């Protein structure tokens, strides 16, 4: 839905991100216990995702901090909104298309096999015999071990958005907000907004706004269920509801609060094909 190609952004920037709507069939996906050097939000639209830390069902938002272990994930089915992004560490987020190219190159080398979210090296090949698949790809791309930051949160946070009270937004008639949380030192915010018919919601925070239900217009352009809007820092827009609307906001880090180190990417990344996901897990729920 959103990546560096769609938005014409630098895939090597420390504020790079990826967003998609994933549909997963019963029994199609599982993942071992692992961690990442980036952060992610997941919002379940329908179905369930079961982790050791808890079960996500419709309306549950998961925040997965950089550096924190989670899983295993042994059951996932349904539809989930996913946003993956570089966190406070400044490690950035390796672009999906870059990972797809790297995975293809690793397969061509025939030094191991990708299986069940893991990379299993052939006997006699240097490196860990068994390694998290994404980690192996990151190390191939960056030509160095993955540097996991010390997690600011020790485990994922799962929020039942329907259990959080909604309050009127001051100065905005017909608009209520459920504040789902503010996370990390980069002040990532998440919220849900309920708009009555004819209500208006001006927005200006960096991040992605997903329409969960309803219809109307964004600055005159029509919106409907699953319309998504991305705002860069400093941009603004306004939702005008034609019918009752439910809008999910998933914020991204404030740029000035990200450590000033650029993600390392190979020069060949610029020529990589679009819309790639490295593992089955990435194309399904990007574990």
Specify the residue positions occupied by each region the protein language model found.
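Jelly-roll (double-stranded beta-helix
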Residues: 1-43, 48-287
């Amino acid at each position: 839905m959103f990546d560096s190609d769609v938005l014409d952004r630098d895939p090597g920037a420390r504020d790079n991100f990826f967003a998609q709507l994933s549909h997963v069939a019963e029994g199609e996906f599982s993942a071992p216990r692992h961690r990442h050097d980036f952060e992610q939000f997941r919002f379940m639209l329908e179905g369930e995702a079961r982790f050791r830390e808890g079960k996500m069902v419709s309306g549950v938002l998961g925040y997965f901090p950089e550096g924190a272990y989670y899983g295993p994930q042994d059951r996932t089915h349904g539809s989930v909104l996913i946003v993956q992004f570089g966190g406070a560490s400044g490690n950035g987020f390796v672009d999906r298309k870059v990972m797809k190219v790297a995975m293809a190159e690793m397969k061509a080398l025939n030094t191991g096999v990708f299986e069940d979210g893991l990379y299993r090296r052939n006997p006699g090949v240097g490196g860990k015999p068994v390694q998290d698949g994404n980690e192996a790809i990151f190390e191939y791309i960056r030509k160095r071990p993955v540097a996991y930051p010390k997690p600011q949160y020790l485990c994922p946070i799962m929020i039942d958005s329907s259990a959080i009270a909604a309050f009127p937004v001051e100065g905005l008639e017909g608009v209520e907000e459920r504040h789902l949380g503010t996370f990390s030192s980069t002040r990532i915010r998440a919220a849900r907004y309920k708009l009555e018919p004819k209500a208006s919601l001006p927005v200006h925070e960096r991040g992605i706004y997903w329409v969960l239900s309803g219809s109307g217009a964004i600055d005159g352009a029509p919106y409907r269920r699953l319309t998504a809007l991305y705002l860069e820092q400093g941009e603004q827009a306004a939702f005008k509801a034609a019918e009752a609307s439910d809008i999910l906001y998933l914020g991204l880090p404030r740029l000035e609060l990200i450590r000033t180190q650029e993600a390392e990417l190979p020069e060949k990344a610029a020529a990589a094909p679009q819309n790639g996901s490295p593992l089955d897990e990435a194309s399904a729920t990007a574990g």
